[in-house]
C-alpha cells in the first residue's frame, strides 16, 4: 500500500514537472514569436549589460521623458506623446523588464530606476535638463531623479502620482508572480499588468499586444511592488524643496479628500508648484484625459524655455486649477 502511494506521488510530481517544463517552453517560444512579429518602435540602448527601450519623437528642447505607472510601458503614452511631439522632443521608455526592455537587476527601487534613466539619457545623447513626467508609482522615480540629478531636471509633471504617506500593502500574490509568469500561466489565462490593449491609442496597440505577456514584465512589476518600502525610504530622503516647476495632475473620479491632500503636498515640493484636477478622469489620466497632461507638460516646457507661462494655467474645458 505504501509502495503504491509512493508511486502515485512520484507520478503526480512527474506530471507536474512535465506540465511546468511544457509551460516554460511555450512561454519562451510565444514571447520570441510575438517580439519577432512586432519589433520595437524605438531603439534599444545598452545601459551597462542590459538594454532599455527608448522611443523618441519630435524636435526641440527641453526634451520630455515619459515614465509609466506600475506594469505600464511606453505604449501607455500613445495619446500624449504625439501631441507633445508637436512642440518639443519627447521620449517614452520602458523600465527594465517592461515592454521591449531587457530584464534588469533587483531590487527595482526608485533610486535604481532613476540611475538607469540617467545612464539611458547620457548614452542616448540627451544630457538635459529634461522635463520628467511620472505616472502613478513612477512619480517616485522622477522625484528621486530630480533630487539626485538636479542639474539634469528642468521640471516635473506628476500624474496622479503615488505618495510616500499613502498605504503600501503588497499583495501576497506578488511573491508568486515570477514563477507563474515563467510557466506561462498568465499568458494562458490572458492576465496582464497595465492597461487593457483596447483602451490604448490605436497607433500603439500592436506594440502592447506583442509585449503584454512577457515574463520579464510581470517579474519587474512584482519586484517594484515587493521593494516598495525601500523606494518609500529613498523618496523620504530626497529634497523636500525643488527649484524647478512641479505640476501635479490628479483625477477627480474616485479620489477622496485624503488622496487630494497628498496630491497637494506633492505640489508643495516647489514654490512654482500647483495642483491641476482632471475632472473627467480616474487614475489613468493619460488615457482618460490626455489633453490635461499635454497642457501641463506644455506649461513646464515653456517655463524651461524662459517664456512667459503661468505655472498653473490650464483650459477651463480640461481641468481645474488649485493654486
PLM features: residue spans?
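Active-site loop/oxyanion-hole signature of alpha/beta-hydrolase fold enzymes
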Residues: 55-57, 95-133
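Conserved hydrolase catalytic core segment
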Residues: 127-170
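Alpha/beta-hydrolase fold catalytic core
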Residues: 1-62, 86-88, 302-323
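Conserved serine/cysteine hydrolase catalytic core
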Residues: 202-277
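Conserved HGGG/HGGXW glycine-rich cap/lid loop of the alpha/beta-hydrolase fold
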Residues: 50-100
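A catalytic-pocket lid/entrance helix-loop region that shapes and gates access to the active site
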Residues: 158-194
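Generic structural signal for small/hydrophobic residues in well-ordered secondary structure
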Residues: 45-47, 54, 65, 84, ...
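Catalytic active-site module of serine/aspartate enzymes centered on a nucleophile-bearing elbow/loop
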Residues: 271-323
